[in-house]
């Protein structure tokens, strides 16, 4: 994906800008994260959080959720039209944790949405700064991707739960714009389309009338987004067929599931960016760092440098392992839930273990959990090396992969063979003959069968020392391919309940 041509880089999508040169992009991304930081500092003042409390990731998440909720116009309108008991449509809030007498106390706060919107705009030069809001949504999405599996959702859509590596961004709200669409995995887009088609099958009026026309436009737009993620002509041609379907139904669902499976080997291009919790940007702003002046990139060294010198904390439950909690958050910060663990081991410089072996639950604490036994510890978010984030799926090769997750979706441009279990994947394409046959299908299956293990992805790309800011001396790591490389391997992570 080197020849970007007329495509906007995802930094430009992120900041809603037209084509800009590298310096302008760095400045506008800097302005975006600086705005998040200024807002966070202001909210800490507003809520009277001391330095330690402001560095608590749970407080950061509550503050992020409050501003996202304040700007969620559709939900706000819905709440006003359907008043429910105990929900004030004009207020938003959540748990804030304070340190009192050597213990963490939970306090449920409520704030006027108007007031929060005012603080947000003030921190962003009077603008709505939707790019910053989307950035926080992507951070929450990356955290969900790292914490939960989507087995139930996959099964509901008729997809194989082992296709979890395609599910990046599956909890992102629809309103997350172009930057949100860029980070959604192939499986996520397929699932959204299948849900839509199923509604059409069950509801005669779904595609009819003025509303139906709008639905159809949304359907075709989603098809085009998914088509843009595929890197082969045959996959794209199949997407055209799905998009042009007169009356989308089971044939289209079949095609979409076929395409999702094919993406396990013929990978789609999915953007990755390091989105950090608001408190990290807040700390930098509070220490006088000028993001806009210095410039910032979500896909280069900047997030790594920021995490090298940010000390943030997390609440820890009695049976949880603080090192494991750190790994969870570190992976989320770099959008690396579906990356090969061998690559992550190398970059982080400490052993990265599969989700099922992590002694940690999600970051957020439920309101019914007992605070008496809850402690806090520092999150270790530093890395040994850094690497450039990728938006390409890499080319595909035949490698051993696991029972729980049968493919990876690379996050970093680092030279390696990409693992996948060809036998398992190809087995999914035999049998079941009552579907449409087409040249495209035959062509896709042929390409999948011919994917070779000698093909190395990201030729010559490596990791860099943290002192090598300009990425001049790549270190190409060699990986032990006999080891297991997938994160959701034979896993028992909690389900994400939407």
UniProtKB/Swiss-Prot annotation:
GO terms for cellular component: helical viral capsid; host cell; host cell nucleus; ribonucleoprotein complex; viral nucleocapsid. Late in virus-infected cells, may be cleaved from a 56-kDa protein to a 53-kDa protein by a cellular caspase. This cleavage might be a marker for the onset of apoptosis in infected cells or have a specific function in virus host interaction. Pfam families: Flu_NP. InterPro entries: Flu_NP. It is found in: Virion; Host nucleus. The keyword Calcium does not apply. The keyword Ribonucleoprotein applies. One of its GO terms (biological process) is viral penetration into host nucleus. Its main location: virion. Residues 1-21 are annotated as: Disordered. Keywords: Capsid protein, Helical capsid protein, Host nucleus, Host-virus interaction, Ribonucleoprotein, RNA-binding, Viral nucleoprotein, Viral penetration into host nucleus, Virion, Virus entry into host cell. GO terms for molecular function: RNA binding; structural molecule activity. A motif (Bipartite nuclear localization signal) lies at residues 198-216. A motif (Unconventional nuclear localization signal) lies at residues 1-18. Encapsidates the negative strand viral RNA, protecting it from nucleases. The encapsidated genomic RNA is termed the ribonucleoprotein (RNP) and serves as template for transcription and replication. The RNP needs to be localized in the host nucleus to start an infectious cycle, but is too large to diffuse through the nuclear pore complex. NP comprises at least 2 nuclear localization signals that are responsible for the active RNP import into the nucleus through cellular importin alpha/beta pathway. Belongs to the influenza viruses nucleoprotein family. Homomultimerizes to form the nucleocapsid. May bind host exportin-1/XPO1. Binds to viral genomic RNA. Protein-RNA contacts are mediated by a combination of electrostatic interactions between positively charged residues and the phosphate backbone and planar interactions between aromatic side chains and bases. This is Nucleoprotein. The lineage of its organism: Viruses, Riboviria, Orthornavirae, Negarnaviricota, Polyploviricotina.
């Amino acid at each position: 994906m080197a020849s970007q041509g007329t495509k906007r880089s995802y930094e430009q999508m992120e900041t809603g800008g037209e084509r800009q040169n590298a310096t302008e992009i760095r400045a506008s991304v800097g302005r975006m994260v600086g705005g998040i930081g200024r807002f966070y500092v202001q909210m800490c003042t507003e809520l009277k959080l001391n330095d330690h409390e402001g560095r608590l990731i749970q407080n950061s998440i509550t503050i992020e959720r409050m501003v996202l909720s304040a700007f969620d116009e559709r939900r706000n309108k819905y709440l006003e039209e359907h008043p429910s008991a105990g929900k004030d449509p004009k207020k938003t809030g959540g748990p804030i944790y304070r340190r009192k007498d050597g213990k963490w106390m939970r306090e449920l706060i409520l704030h006027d949405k108007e007031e929060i919107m005012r603080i947000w705009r003030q921190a962003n030069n009077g603008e709505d700064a939707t790019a910053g809001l989307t950035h926080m949504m992507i951070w929450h999405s990356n955290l969900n991707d790292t914490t939960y599996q989507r087995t139930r959702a996959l099964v509901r859509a008729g997809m194989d739960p082992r296709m979890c590596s395609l599910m990046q961004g599956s909890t992102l709200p629809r309103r997350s714009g172009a930057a949100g669409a860029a980070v959604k995995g192939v499986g996520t887009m397929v699932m959204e389309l299948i849900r839509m088609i199923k509604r059409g099958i069950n509801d005669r009026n779904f595609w009819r009338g003025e509303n139906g026309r709008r639905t159809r436009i949304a359907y075709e737009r989603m098809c085009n987004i998914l088509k843009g993620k595929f890197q082969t002509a045959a996959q794209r041609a199949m997407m055209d067929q799905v998009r042009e379907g007169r009356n989308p139904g089971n044939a289209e669902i079949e095609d979409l599931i076929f395409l999702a499976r094919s993406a396990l080997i013929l990978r789609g291009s999915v953007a990755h960016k390091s989105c950090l919790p608001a408190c990290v940007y807040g700390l930098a702003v509070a220490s006088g760092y000028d993001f806009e002046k210095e410039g910032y990139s979500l896909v280069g060294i900047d997030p790594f440098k920021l995490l090298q010198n940010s000390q943030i904390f997390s609440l820890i439950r009695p049976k949880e392992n603080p090192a494991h909690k750190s790994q969870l958050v570190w992976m989320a910060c770099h959008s690396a839930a579906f990356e090969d663990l061998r690559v992550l081991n190398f970059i982080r410089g400490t052993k990265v273990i599969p989700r099922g072996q992590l002694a940690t639950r999600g970051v957020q604490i439920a309101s019914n959990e007992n605070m008496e036994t809850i402690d806090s510890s520092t999150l270790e978010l530093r890395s040994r090396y850094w690497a450039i984030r990728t938006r390409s799926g890499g080319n595909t090769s035949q490698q051993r992969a696991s029972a729980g997750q049968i493919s990876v979706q690379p996050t970093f441009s680092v030279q390696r063979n990409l693992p996948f279990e060809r036998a398992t994947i190809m087995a999914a394409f035999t049998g079941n003959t009552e579907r449409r046959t087409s040249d495209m299908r035959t062509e896709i299956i042929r390409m999948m069968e011919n994917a070779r293990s000698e093909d190395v992805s990201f030729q010559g790309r490596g990791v860099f020392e943290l002192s090598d800011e300009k990425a001049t001396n790549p270190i190409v790591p060699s990986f032990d391919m006999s080891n297991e490389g997938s994160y959701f391997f034979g896993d028992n992570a909690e389900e994400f309940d939407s």
